[in-house]
Amino acid sequence: MKHAVKHIHFVGVGGAGMSGIAEILHNLGYTVSGSDQADGAVTRRLAELGIRIFVGHDAAHIAGAQAVVTSTAVKGDNPEVIAARAARIPVVPRAVMLAELMRLKSGIAIAGTHGKTTTTSLVTSVLAEAGLDPTFVIGGKLNSAGANSALGKGDYIVVEADESDASFLNLLPVLSVITNIDADHMDTYGHDFARLKQAFVEFLHKMPFYGAAILCGDDPGVRSIIPMISRPVITYGLGEDVQVRAVDVVALPGGQMRFTCQRRNGTVLPDLEITLNLPGVHSVRNALATIAVATELELPDAPIVSALAKFSGVGRRFQRWGDWPCAAGGEFTLIDDYGHHPVEMAAVIAAARGAFPGRRLVLAFQPHRYTRTRDCFEDFVKVMGSADAILLTEVYAAGEAPIVAADGRSLTRALRVAGKVDPLFVDDVNELPATIAEQALAGDVVIAMGAGTIGGVPARVVELVKERA
């Protein structure tokens, strides 16, 4: 690739997956440029690295490029895409470029509806702790590295495999993890759950015959595809019939999990006593997937235990913003999370209950996509009803047209009718920081959750609280 193409341009370079690939290609010696609709922390960081960044989209931005990479969010009518095609410059999806990077190393791909980013980060951290210096491309910022990607000198590349547009079928890993399979992004699969599951089977069969499928045995969707897989399978979970199992699971106050890991994959290996620096049973399963990967790679036990104990988290995955003064006295705890599906929401609420027992849980949620709100409406109502207080904003459209009865006000009404919690609807997400800063009570645990613009809310809450002090 290097001999044929020297200048690569990214359209939508500010996206989590795009920016990571752009940075790695830059570090490999390519000339990299990119454009995005708006300037932000990610684009500014890329510019500081020496990557030429354009704000806005214009045909002139692709000048000199020999390949153009597009994110899923970029449409065919983008002027840079149109200009590239007119000039017969190859236009390739992000996943195709990621697949090219994976050809340079032995690839470990983490797939699944939920938990991909955290599991990818955990695997990366364990490999780094073992001295393997992996390359990684993650959908969120790995706090210990301060970035969502890095070019390592070792033999492995660890990547997050995205099923949302079926682009993970471009990847060719040697080890693959599937954390779970839930009904999400169903427009891609014709609203057919069987088609979604078949895509995961195809993904696993992209591995060579000597690859291994590391699968969550606790998840019904994953279990249902095991008979269709013709690669070696390693299962993990909390159930009795898995090969990498957690027993004696205890939630520790403050947000850690303690458990014993039993490994029974053909040979019986020593049990591992794990203290995981993440909250929630869902995090235990992500750690088990990581242990299964590390065991398959025959890594020593010490770096596995050490990396899990000191894992410093991922941006916007149960990310703690600290304890802050309430307007009426006392302090509240502020947490940020990317979760945008009812299953993720339930896991985060359960994790918060375990980490902060007895405290009032306030969920500030910005729904993401009208189609997901429609498809998961009743599940959202049920799960949100398990919080103690709810702040709801309007749906973040992500380019979708509004759908009747699948908006924030409809969710608010449905929650009110259900009667478990009386939600407050905040029409403009920009008003949410002030609402949180003014209304949080002493002892509250406030979780700002969603995949849209709510990601900027915690920082603004902190600013407002500091201004008030």
UniProtKB/Swiss-Prot annotation:
SUPFAM superfamilies: MurCD N-terminal domain, MurD-like peptide ligases, catalytic domain, MurD-like peptide ligases, peptide-binding domain
Keywords: ATP-binding, Cell cycle, Cell division, Cell shape, Cell wall biogenesis/degradation, Cytoplasm, Ligase, Nucleotide-binding, Peptidoglycan synthesis
Protein EC: 6.3.2.8
GO molecular function: ATP binding; UDP-N-acetylmuramate-L-alanine ligase activity
Residue ranges of the TM segments: none
Catalytic activity: UDP-N-acetyl-alpha-D-muramate + L-alanine + ATP = UDP-N-acetyl-alpha-D-muramoyl-L-alanine + ADP + phosphate + H(+)
Biological process according to GO: cell division; cell wall organization; peptidoglycan biosynthetic process; regulation of cell shape
One GO cellular component term: cytoplasm
Residues that hold ATP according to the record: 112-118
Compartments (UniProt record): Cytoplasm
Listed InterPro entries: Mur-like_cat_sf, Mur_ligase_C, Mur_ligase_C_dom_sf, Mur_ligase_cen, Mur_ligase_N, MurCDEF_pg_biosynth, UDP-N-AcMur_Ala_ligase_MurC
Pathway(s) per entry: Cell wall biogenesis; peptidoglycan biosynthesis
Principal subcellular localisation of the protein: cytoplasm
PANTHER family on file: UDP-N-ACETYLMURAMATE--L-ALANINE LIGASE, UDP-N-ACETYLMURAMATE--L-ALANINE LIGASE-RELATED
Family, as annotated: Belongs to the MurCDEF family.
Described function: Cell wall formation.
Name this polypeptide is given: UDP-N-acetylmuramate--L-alanine ligase
Source organism (scientific name): Leptothrix cholodnii (strain ATCC 51168 / LMG 8142 / SP-6) (Leptothrix discophora (strain SP-6))
Gene: murC
